[in-house]
Amino acid sequence: MGSRRRTRQGLSIHVESVLGKGISMQIETVAKEGFLPVRVHPTDAGADLRADIPEPVTLQPRESTFFNTGIEVAIPEGYFGALAIRSSLACKHGLMLANSLGIIDSCYRGPVKAKLVNIGRRPYTINPGDRIAQLLIIPCVHATFIQVDELPESDRGTGGFGSTGAQ
C-alpha cells in the first residue's frame, strides 16, 4: 500500500497509484480499536472498512441501519471517496448500501458511515469489527455544464436500457 506515519490529527497514509504517482490522505481513527482501512491485496482498488459497533447487530429482511466505520477522513482536493458494499456481503447475503454508492466529498470531515439494508430473505448479523464496506479514492473531474438548444448526433442516438443488445 504505502508508508504510514503518525500525525497529531490521526494517521497519514501515502498511497501509490498504478502510474507511480501517490497521494497522502489523513485518517483519524475515532473507534476504540482504531480500525484503519485495509487492502487485503496491494492491488485492490478499495480498502475495507470495519463496523465500529459495541455489540452484534442483526438486520432483518428489508431492515436498514447506519454503521459507523470508526474513521474520519481528509480526502485531498481533486479527489473524492466512493463508499461501496463489499461484494461478498451483496452476493452471498443480500446486503446493500442504502444509497447504492456513497460519495464522500473532499471538504467533508465528519464520521464515515455506511447505511446497510438487508434485501435478502434471511436475517444477517454484523459483528463488531466485521468488514462492511470499501473505500475508494478517485480523481474528480469538474465539468463545465453548457446549455444548448440541441445535442449533436451520435451513432447510438436515444437508445438506452439494453437497446444495444436488442435482437
Where are these regions (language model features)?
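DUTPase catalytic domain/fold
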Residues: 2-167
